């Protein structure tokens, strides 16, 4: 059976929500909310990849593992790859990248993505969910994925494109994309060695580098809602959700 590892990229230099990973939510920092969800999935070891000593200390002080990475990375996937190189992973075939601002991600969805991707030997896979509100189509902080076919429980479809803003009726199969990817190690290595594509730069979405270079991304439907924390409004909504 092939083995997996989870690496969570995280840094302090967020423009929309300063010091985001260290914001306390119900007496726990955002990065530790994400770390604990990853641990609960039980698919493999979990590390935080960061260039900031403050994040490293927070993770370490709470019993977690971290890897220090270069400050100059412009996206999470490059940071994840550097961490994987430093870990010298000899027995790991799959590397999961969970973005450090996805505290709502459900451990069961993490586990299901890992299980189905391994069974079908997918090179790159990710999760999506049905869009819940019409205004989400215009919200650039909620990334949308267009799939080739409709996805339902345990079905998989190829991602055709990703957008930050899109018209609701422009395509048949539009879903909310989650900040999580499972890579075969070989696919991750190929991805980080590709040049940034024009669409990637235009949309500020690193996954478009794969699409633009004919690297297939398979999309699975998540069973539970999740949304990244990018703004103060996102943060307030997450706190309200926890306190219900």
Predicted regions and their residues:
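Conserved core of the sugar-phosphate nucleotidyltransferase
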Residues: 106-197
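Short, acidic/turn-prone active-site loops that include or flank metal/cofactor-
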Residues: 12, 70-76, 224-226
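Conserved alpha/beta core of the MobA/IspD/sugar-nucleotide pyrophosphorylase nucleotidyltransferase superfamily
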Residues: 172-244
């Amino acid at each position: 059976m092939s083995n997996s590892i989870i690496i969570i990229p995280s840094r302090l230099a967020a423009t929309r929500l300063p010091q985001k990973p260290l914001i306390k939510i119900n007496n726990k920092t955002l990065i530790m909310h994400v770390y604990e969800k990853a641990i609960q999935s039980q698919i493999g070891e979990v590390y935080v990849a960061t260039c900031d000593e403050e994040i490293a200390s927070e993770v370490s002080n709470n019993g977690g593992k971290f890897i220090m990475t270069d400050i100059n990375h412009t996206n999470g996937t490059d940071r994840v790859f550097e961490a994987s190189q430093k870990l010298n992973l000899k027995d790991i075939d799959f590397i999961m990248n969970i973005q450090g601002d996805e505290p709502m991600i459900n451990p069961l969805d993490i586990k299901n993505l890992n299980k189905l991707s391994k069974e079908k030997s997918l090179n790159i896979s990710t999760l999506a969910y049905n869009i819940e509100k019409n205004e989400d189509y215009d919200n650039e902080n909620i990334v949308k994925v267009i799939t080739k076919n409709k996805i339902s429980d345990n079905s998989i479809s190829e991602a055709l494109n990703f957008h930050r803003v899109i018209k609701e009726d422009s395509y048949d199969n539009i879903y909310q994309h989650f900040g999580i990817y499972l890579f075969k190690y070989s696919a991750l290595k190929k991805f980080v060695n590709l040049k940034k594509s024009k669409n990637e730069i235009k949309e500020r979405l690193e996954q478009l580098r794969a699409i633009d270079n004919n690297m297939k991304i398979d999309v699975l439907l998540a069973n539970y809602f999740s949304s990244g924390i990018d703004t103060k409004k996102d943060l307030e909504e997450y706190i309200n959700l926890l306190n219900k």
